[in-house]
Amino acid sequence: MSFISYLINGISLGSVYAIIALGYTMVYGIAKMLNFAHGDVIMVGGFVTFTAMTSAGMHPLAAVLLSAVACTVLGVVIERIAYKPLRSASPLAVLITAIGVSYFLQNLALLIFGADTKTFQSVISFDGISLAGGQLKISGVTLVTIAACIIIVVGLTLFIRRTKAGQAMLAVSEDRGAAQLMGINVNGTIALTFAIGSALAAIAGVLLCSAYPSLNPYTGSMPGIKAFVAAVFGGIGSIPGAMLGGILLGIIEILAKAYISSQLADAIVFAVLIVVLLVKPTGIFGKKIQEKV
């Protein structure tokens, strides 16, 4: 049963990566930008939830909703202040700005909450289930995380395909200039994309901290990077690709820790990225883009 247990844990961890990767893939697919500060929004979401529960005594569900709202606002503010002026700038300028925003959020959290790691109280009180006569136990956090990932991916897919806002996102992703000529509010659409991505980061942050109950100003850094790897793995810009890439990456990481070495697990994850880029640079669901001259 140990292999099945590792597999389930890998799917759970991969579900968190998938939710984070959705933020990367949406922003890149629509705004054609890589928001490398996305991982730190995870940390902000965790701290908002932590503070709401410990200092304000809020119910866990209310604290999670507050966290999602706070990160939604944060995402829009970051887009307006940091990224909107750089839409016509070089990718290097956007990258440098993203790193600057990341350091700003980390140091702001360091100033407010200090460097000590906080013990995060899980927002999920469900104990989980036992299978195979008690030989296989699946925690409540694992079940909720996997279910949340499925619901988010399905909901986001339906939102994009069946709502006017979603159709506007598709139009902007295809041709921003043509979308603007058709009367679509490009600025509002891009801001909405950042808002949704940041709200998802908040949810991912809460799930991550519930599974691994610790929180500090750098909590989101490595999960953010791994989620970017997952987005590239699945094909950045593709929602199904983000989900598949995240889950595969989570399984690879957990199995590497279990059967190879916990110290080498991160190296193996990044080695997978290198192999994918060599074999299929566009990722599993990525499409080749032909430049017309």
Regions picked out by a protein language model, each given a short descriptive name:
Residues Y24, G57-V101, L108, L244-L249, ...:
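Alpha-helical transmembrane segments within multi-pass membrane transporters and channels
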Residues P85-L86, P91-R162, T189, L255, ...:
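Transmembrane helix-bundle core of multi-pass membrane transporters
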